[in-house]
Amino acid sequence: MRIITGNQPPKADTHYSVYNVDGKYINSIGMRPGNIRLTDLRWEQVMDWNLGWNIGLFNDLLTADINLYSKQTSDLFTNDPKIPSTSGFTSLPTENGGDMKNQGYEINLSLNRVKIAGDLSATFNLTFANNRNTITAMDPIRLAAINGTGVNVPDNGEYMTRVLLNNPFGALYGLRYKGVYAYSYDHFDQAQAEGATCPVARDANGNVIYGPDGTPMQMYYNYTQTKYAFKGGDAIYEDINHDGSIDHYDVVYLGSSLPKLTGGFGFRLYYKGWSLNAQFNYRYGNKIANVARMNAEKMHGSENQSTAVNYRWRKEGDGADGSHVLPRALYGAGYNWLGSDRFVEDGSFLRLNYLQFSYGFESKLIRRIGLSRLSLYVSGENLFCLTRYSGVDPEVGYGGMGVTTDNATTPRAKSYTLGLTATF
């Protein structure tokens, strides 16, 4: 079924000219414009469809709910778009900034109370879903305001915000981290002899680039402005265009914050009066910027640091043998913690969300004490999580224009419950 609905502008009175009483002029009350009248502002239009099936097989022993959906939003509202200050204002309240499409599916499968052997029976459930969003159109001025001028240089602790047409929100953009320079530029000959890394520019084939004077071209951070010369112990970032400068030309796509698959599964086993209920949830295929680890390894300020920094670069030649070392400590200086794939991790996980073990007493036993039902149970929540993510909890919220970042938020608590249920 296809339906067109809409949303009214999020801020009121934007189609009127508003004047505010402010100050005085020649001993009279002064007034000034309070807004810019938006004569072209339109309702946001949403056109969506949903196709679903409810299936039951073998007398509903196996059931399935399948849903496919698509949602196309036109004249999408974007808040506080920047405008030239010559207008007397720095931004508009809102505007119709673009179009976006969301589409995906959700499938729920259930196997209901199937007999396994004797008094043992079970139920099973499985859910998996996928949602993809795509920016199909956006006002060029708004797009430029989000993405910058195109010459924005990545900085320490920052991942670039990018919105590209026909791409999803939540994409991660940054540099590619390639390790640590074992030697400084002045030790080029020694580095060459050992086959070790040194901050010199190389072409696409890995050959050293030499300048007009016959000396190797040194690697810099943002050569045209900052002109910071990389040294031994500094982080190596891939020079995508092989110009000897790490800058905006070297920013690449690092992955999406949106998972490829989300869902859960579980089972419940029954044996006489006993039952075991286990429920899992999972997420697969999303990327997380582990900013907590970044801050714990940056060695840039006076904050507490991870024990991993004990294995940092300290002297010329450290790491030349291929051993893993972190970049050197540089208090308040350097560019060793730029937003790169060094801190981007796979956020996939499998979590045992709930587990309950219970026993229901037989009716003939409990009727003697005036009860119609009595059961005892013990349960636990968030009992374990299987993941390769190095942070405290991979279940980080995602969605919106920004990237998914983990700033050491408080993880979900693990809990246990012992209970008794009685019915009179």
Where are these regions (language model features)?
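Extracellular/periplasmic, surface-exposed regions of secreted and cell-surface proteins
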Residues: 1-165, 339-424
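Membrane-proximal, glycine/serine-rich, low-complexity loop/turn segments characteristic
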Residues: 6-21, 142-146, 176, 180, ...
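Conserved small-residue
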Residues: 114-255, 297
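Conserved SET/PR-domain catalytic core that frames the SAM/AdoMet-binding pocket
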Residues: 125, 249, 259-273, 353-358
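Extracytoplasmic gating/loop element in the C-terminal half of outer-membrane beta-barrel translocons
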Residues: 229-232, 283-375, 379-380
